[in-house]
C-alpha cells in the first residue's frame, strides 16, 4: 500500500483495544487486559497502573509497528453505565468521567510517544446506549447539561489526532440523526467539546445507520 502511494508513513489503521476487541488474537492474547481491568488498577494500585498500562501500550505499539500499522482506534472514552448495552461494558475504564479522562490522557500520550496515532471513541459518548449499535439505533434522552458533565466530559481537552463518532441519536439535541450524520452534533463536538482534529466514522455497515450513503 505504501509503495503504491509513495509514502512510507501512509496511514494504516487497526482496531486493537485489547480485551475482547483484538484483531491480532492469532499473534498475541490480550483477552484479560480489558479497559475495565486497567481502570480498577488506576483506582486501587495507581503505581502499578502506571508501569503496567505503559508496558501494555509499549508492547502493543511494538507489535503494531512490526506489522506496519501506525494508527490504533484506542482509547475508548465511553462511560460504563449500569443498565446499558454490554457493547461497551468492560471496554470502558470506569463509571467515573474524571477517571476515564485521566486514563485516556495517559493512553494517548504514551501511544504518541511510541509513534502510534490514536482514535478516541465513540465521541461524544456511547455509554448510555441501551441497544447495540451494530444492530439497532440507540436513542439517548438525557439533556445537554447532564451529558456535558458525564458522557461528553472525557472527550474534552484531548490531543488525539483522530476521534471516531458514535452511531447514536441524542434526542434532546438532534432527534432525527445519529451523531455521524448530524450537523448539530458535529458542531457540538467542535465547539462545546472542543475537538478540532480529524473526525472519522464508526463502521458504516452498522445497522444503526439508515438510508443510503447519498442520503
What do these predicted ranges mean?
Residues 21-24, 80-85, 127-131, 172:
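Short acidic/His/Gly/Ser-rich catalytic and metal-binding motifs that mark active-site loops
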Residues 14, 90, 121-123:
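Short glycine- and Lys/Arg-enriched binding-loop motifs that mark or flank ligand-binding interfaces
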Amino acid at each position: 500500500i505504501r509503495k503504491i502511494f509513495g509514502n512510507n508513513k501512509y496511514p494504516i489503521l487497526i482496531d486493537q483495544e485489547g480485551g475482547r476487541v483484538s484483531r491480532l488474537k492469532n499473534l498475541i492474547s490480550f483477552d484479560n487486559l480489558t479497559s475495565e481491568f486497567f481502570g480498577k488498577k488506576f483506582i486501587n494500585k495507581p503505581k502499578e497502573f502506571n508501569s503496567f498500562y505503559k508496558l501494555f501500550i509499549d508492547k502493543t505499539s511494538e507489535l503494531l509497528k512490526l506489522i506496519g500499522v501506525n494508527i490504533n482506534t484506542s482509547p475508548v472514552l465511553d462511560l460504563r453505565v449500569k443498565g446499558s448495552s454490554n457493547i461497551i461494558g468492560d471496554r470502558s475504564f470506569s463509571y467515573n468521567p474524571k477517571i476515564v479522562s485521566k486514563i485516556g490522557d495517559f493512553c494517548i500520550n504514551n501511544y504518541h510517544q511510541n509513534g502510534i496515532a490514536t482514535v478516541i471513541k465513540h465521541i461524544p459518548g456511547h455509554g448510555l446506549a441501551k441497544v447495540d449499535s451494530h444492530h439497532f439505533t440507540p436513542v439517548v434522552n438525557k439533556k445537554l447539561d447532564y451529558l456535558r458533565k458525564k458522557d461528553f466530559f472525557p472527550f474534552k481537552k484531548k490531543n488525539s489526532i483522530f476521534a471516531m463518532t458514535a452511531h447514536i441519536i441524542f434526542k434532546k439535541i438532534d432527534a432525527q440523526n445519529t451523531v455521524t450524520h448530524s450537523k448539530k452534533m458535529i458542531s457540538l463536538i467542535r465547539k462545546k467539546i472542543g475537538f478540532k482534529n480529524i473526525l472519522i466514522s464508526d463502521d458504516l455497515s452498522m445497522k444503526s445507520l439508515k438510508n443510503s450513503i447519498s442520503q
